Amino acid sequence: MRRLTSAELDAYDVLPRALATRVRIQRMPFLTPGSNGMTIGRVVFLRNDGIHDGSRKITAHELVHVRQYYELGLLRFLARYLSGYARALWKHRRHRAAYYAIPFEQQAYAEADEWLARKALASPQ
């Protein structure tokens, strides 16, 4: 288990730096099929964790979840996440469609996309 590097702390602005310094990253090659990352509280599990330069969209996405956990607390976040998934699964009848319909996932994908766009604009051409 590792902490975010200084490059990652500088790059990932999707959560407050004070919270980012408390994040732990754990490589977990055996995540569920189709999943590259998962977050529980301030621990981020990544299928691959070989790049530590602050350039990975999956890390930005998972760090949004760290912030969501922090803002709501563990139990409220999990209750809302799972109820969002259950409602979406009832509606869509397929796991993948239900996953993408979870409000917390939509927010994390949107913020990671915005983060990547800001990063692209800031980098010299």
Short names for language-model regions:
Residues 1-36, 53, 73-125:
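Metalloprotease/metallohydrolase-associated module, dominated by Zn2+-dependent proteases
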Residues 36-39, 43-60, 70, 98-101:
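Short pre-active-site segment immediately N-terminal to the catalytic Zn-binding motif
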Residues 46, 64, 112-114:
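Generic hydrophobic/packing signal
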Residues 64-72:
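Active-site-flanking alpha-helical
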